Amino acid sequence: MALVVICGQPCSGKSIAAVTLAETLKESETKQSVRIIDEASFHLDRNQNYANMPAEKNLRGKLRSDVDRSVSTGEIVIVDSLNSIKGYRYELWCIARAAGIRYCVVYCDVDEAHCRQWNKERSDRGEDGYDDGIFEDLVRRFEKPERRNRWDSPLFELYPSREVIDKSSPVILEAVTYLTKTVDSKTQDVRILQPSIATQAARFSEANSLYELDRATQEIINAIVEQQSLGAAISRVTLGNELPPIEICRPIGLPELRRLRRTFVKLMGQSSLSGPPLPTDADSAKRRFVDYLNREFGGNNA
């Protein structure tokens, strides 16, 4: 339906803007279904999220993955986070383009002094504020959106330090109109992104890889169950096809095997966001799963 990226310095009123926009959309004539994806939904500590680059990269990966799953639900998805890096906003724009939906950026333009003051007030109230060092680092690295960039356009700018942001705010109403306006052949002021061949191919490739991973891991589970069902105690499961054997020192029940399989598939999906891609053939997927099981069984048997 649509993807809205909330952008701004730390403690610049982004969450207020996100909630206000969501409520206004829900109360609009079209009664839109809205979902806010924010950092709090992952139950992670704010300062831990930005303590170092790996932690920050992990947070962005979680947000991006959640957005990717949500844009096809028919809801308007609002991403309430710093979204301070232009390369990351470009990635979110690519998700919207691949889904063929509307996209916009809402920028909370607040000067550093006000953000710093609001962060201090939040900490003084015992709320979740940023540590001084982390706050200054985030301010320094912030990349302001520019409407000339396709991934920052259309750009709706709010000024929370100068005006109260509520459902009657002109910019909020303008954004609601953009997100809900009926599009026909005569509409010129609303743009629905069109997926390119490259983005469609990437989604097909990812879906194919997930299918291969799911099928290959299930075959390994079936082989373990089958060889254990022969009756005699075994310490090794042989798989053939030039795959290494699986070393086991105790009977492994089907519930445990299923749990390990689910964990492995989840880990593979998360690591593909920032590390090596998912395997595209069955043998590679099986080999990775066998290596994972040997590590798990080795640790459990020690």
From Swiss-Prot:
Residues 260-273 are annotated as: Calmodulin-binding. Its main location: cytoplasm. Gene3D superfamilies: P-loop containing nucleotide triphosphate hydrolases. GO terms for biological process: 5-carbamoylmethyl uridine residue modification; leaf development; meristem structural organization; regulation of transcription by RNA polymerase II; root meristem growth; tRNA modification; tRNA wobble uridine modification. One of its GO terms (cellular component) is nucleus. Interacts with the elongator complex. Binds to calmodulin in a calcium-dependent manner. Belongs to the KTI12 family. This is Protein KTI12 homolog. It comes from Arabidopsis thaliana (Mouse-ear cress).
